[in-house]
Amino acid sequence: YSLRARPRF
């Protein structure tokens, strides 16, 4: 999924 939207994978 979007890694930019989440600080952690």
Swiss-Prot record:
This is Peptide tyrosine phenylalanine 4. Limited to neuronal cell bodies, neuronal processes and sinus gland. May act as a neurotransmitter, neuromodulator or neurohormone. The modification Phenylalanine amide is found at residue 9. Its main location: secreted. One of its GO terms (biological process) is neuropeptide signaling pathway. It is found in: Secreted.
